[in-house]
Amino acid sequence: MDMKEWEIFYNKIMEDFGFDKDKDVESAVILNNILENANTIPVDKLKDIIEGREVFIFGAGPSIKKHINILKELREINYKNPIIVADGACKAFLEENIIPDIIVSDLDGDLEALFECNRKGSIIVVHAHGDNIEKIKKYVPKLKNVVGSCQIPNYKELNLRNVINFGGFTDGDRCCFLAYHFKAKKLILGGMDFGIYITKYSRPNIKEDIAIGDEIKIKKLEYAKTLINYLKDKIEIEFLK
């Protein structure tokens, strides 16, 4: 994504939520430094998986299990379509014995499921922001096949060689921006509901399978919808029904 365009979104998001830009920078620098010595993979590996293909992208919304069943039927026809999932959605895939090709995570989902998928071959795109610094320090050194991402627009000016800003704000829409960055042919979206309801996959601490999200979560989903709508003019996007 063009960083000048992203900076407009980024500034609005930071102001709207009252987030600390300096913390975002700190987090990006820490992740970049950890990845100097961690089990990273070349970014071109993502390109090999995504470029020119129709890509399935899954959030962790209430429709996730319904859409995984549709995915199973579609993949019987074409098994080569890669799967990219947002963070906690990987647990729903594990329950169906499917290992995503790529998981985009800021490390606030089900970490046990994330690590299991990673052990079984999933690439983890770990995202740095101001609220997950301690999780980055604790968990990233234990992962393998890692790619780093950040949300600060000026990451190149800071000479951060091990993180990339693909664009995107939530794990779900970041999956879409990642696929767009690596020139996917088409995005096929599942588990992307953008409503007021959330699942245990996106918030492991809730007691019910589905619950009403808090105000912050709902606002984040609204931004996710806005950002995905922005991409509609740039790449073909289909929502599973």
Curated annotation (Swiss-Prot):
Pathway: Cofactor biosynthesis; 5,6,7,8-tetrahydromethanopterin biosynthesis. The keyword Disulfide bond does not apply. Its EC number is 2.7.6.3. SUPFAM superfamilies: Thiamin pyrophosphokinase, catalytic domain. One of its GO terms (molecular function) is kinase activity. Coiled coil: none annotated. Its cofactor is Mg(2+). The keyword Membrane does not apply. GO terms for biological process: tetrahydromethanopterin biosynthetic process; thiamine diphosphate biosynthetic process. Keywords: ATP-binding, Kinase, Magnesium, Nucleotide-binding, Transferase. It catalyses: 6-hydroxymethyl-7,8-dihydropterin + ATP = (7,8-dihydropterin-6-yl)methyl diphosphate + AMP + H(+). InterPro entries: HMPDK_MptE, MptE-like, TPK_catalytic_sf. Belongs to the archaeal 6-HMPDK family. Catalyzes the transfer of diphosphate from ATP to 6-hydroxymethyl-7,8-dihydropterin (6-HMD), leading to 6-hydroxymethyl-7,8-dihydropterin diphosphate (6-HMDP). HAMAP family: HMPDK_arch. This is 6-hydroxymethyl-7,8-dihydropterin pyrophosphokinase. It comes from Methanocaldococcus jannaschii (strain ATCC 43067 / DSM 2661 / JAL-1 / JCM 10045 / NBRC 100440). The lineage of its organism: Archaea, Methanobacteriati, Methanobacteriota, Methanomada group, Methanococci.
